[in-house]
Amino acid sequence: ALRAGGRRAVGMKPVASGCTLGVDGWRNDDALVLQAASLPTPAYAQVKPYPFPAATAPQIAAAQVGVRVQMAPMQAAFEALAASADVVVVEGVGGWMAPLADGFEQAQLARALQLPVLLVVGLKLGCLNHARLSERAILDDGLQLAGWIGNQLVPQLDYGSEYFELLQRSLRSPCLGLLPHGD
């Protein structure tokens, strides 16, 4: 949407788990999609400073390969991306309350990069609780919550429209849209 509006926008996934090893190193499908959707096209290492093979929580994936996720590499990658684009969209890692390392939370990353937060809510059973708790945690962390987007995870969900309507009524932040399944 940013690019369609004429903005130079790039994506970043600071920590990527579930990577596969190829001739060019560790690669993650989500990070590759972000790289392909970015304009200008950034270096892959800037899109994804921390690649991990295990498809699990970032702190666990990092520990399995003896790495401690730290702010400096992510800050440097973000600054390089920001120097070449109007907007850098940073994808979250494992959910708002998933720690990046001992004593290093998602909120610290968002605060250091001076980013507003956009909550993406996967529409499924349990999404009402998840979204309300996440919104509360983001606001309690003192961050700007720009709004939320509903994400249709499956083509047909029993009570999907009811979930979406209830989210619109119960969340304090504005709904910025609904992503149809497959987009």
Regions found by a protein language model. Name each.
Residues 4, 80, 87, 92-178:
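Conserved catalytic-core segment of NTP-binding enzymes
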Residues 14, 180-181:
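Active-site donor-binding loop signature of nucleotide-sugar glycosyltransferases
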Residues 17-20, 125, 156, 183:
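Surface-exposed, flexible loop/turn segments at secondary-structure boundaries
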Residues 53, 181-183:
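A short acidic, often aromatic-flanked loop/helix-cap motif at beta-alpha or helix-coil junctions
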Residues 62, 162-163, 183:
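Short, surface-exposed amphipathic charged segments that create phosphate/polyanion-binding patches used
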